[in-house]
């Protein structure tokens, strides 16, 4: 249980200071040579989704999330930028959402954001149990292959 406590602190900090965090991320994305691919793991996926759905970010050609709770936060109406029942603005698509059934902090997006084109869930299986599965994405070659396969052309 102790290993999850820093994550809870991060989420609480983001809930309190999310505007400044999103502002810093938007500054990092601004002026980048296209294509721009934004990659977020766990809370980073929430930050990116909040940023992109609020219309505060420069254009992003592909959103990649791994082990993200964004779909859960949307389903329980806890995202800061878009409310359950509202139309979700599409500037964050295409969205490649990578999840792992062993990762209890990872959620599918296609069903939760039903009716929005451009969202693709892809499952990986690094074959490690939770909680190690939550950090295992970056040790799985399939994750990098999925990003390569979805990299924007042009």
Q: Could you describe each region identified by the protein language model?
A:
Residues 1-39, 43-154:
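Lipid deacylating catalytic domains
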């Amino acid at each position: 249980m102790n290993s999850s406590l820093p994550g809870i602190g991060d989420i609480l900090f983001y809930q309190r200071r999310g505007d400044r965090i999103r502002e810093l991320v938007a500054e990092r994305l601004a002026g980048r040579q296209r294509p721009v691919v934004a990659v977020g793991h766990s809370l980073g996926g929430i930050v990116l989704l909040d940023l992109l759905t609020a219309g505060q970010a420069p254009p992003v050609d592909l959103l990649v999330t791994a082990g993200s709770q964004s779909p859960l936060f949307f389903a329980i109406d806890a995202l800061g930028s878009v409310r359950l029942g509202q139309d979700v603005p599409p500037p964050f698509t295409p969205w490649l959402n990578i999840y792992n059934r062993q990762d209890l902090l990872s959620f599918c997006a296609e069903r939760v954001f039903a009716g929005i084109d451009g969202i693709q869930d892809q499952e990986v299986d690094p074959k490690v149990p939770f909680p190690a599965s939550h950090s295992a994405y970056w040790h799985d070659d399939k994750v990098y292959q999925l990003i390569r396969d979805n990299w924007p052309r042009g």
